[in-house]
Design a protein with these regions (language model features):
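Phosphate/ATP-binding catalytic cores across multiple sugar-kinase/actin-like superfamilies
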Residues: 83-90
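Early-domain small/polar-rich strand-loop-helix modules and first-structured segments
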Residues: 1-82
């Protein structure tokens, strides 16, 4: 065991067109819809996953929802990056509480 093993954690990410899974220690810790809600004017991410899905079609015109994957392929790299970062943060919060 190296000195930096304390600071690292192995995770697996399954990017799907409908859902994205994040797995650590052989457990699914994140299972969220593959969708991002962004502010059209600022480009800021407002929500990811279930929260973004709840906003789909029901929000102000300045908020857009994006499905970053189409037919199993990344269609919007920026949105996919935001989604992955957000889901990793959720994973890290989950594992730090465990």
């Amino acid at each position: 065991m190296g000195i930096f093993n304390v600071f690292t954690q192995e995770i697996a990410i399954d990017l799907g067109t409908a859902n994205t899974l994040v797995i650590t220690n052989d457990k699914v810790v994140v299972d969220e819809p593959s969708i991002v809600a962004m502010d059209r004017t600022t480009g800021k991410v407002i929500a990811i996953g279930r929260k973004a899905q709840q906003m789909h079609g029901k929000t102000h015109e300045n908020i857009k929802t994006i499905r970053p994957l189409k037919d199993g392929v990344i269609a919007d790299f920026q949105a996919a990056e935001h989604m992955i970062r957000g889901m990793i943060k959720i994973c890290l919060l989950y594992t730090s509480d465990a």
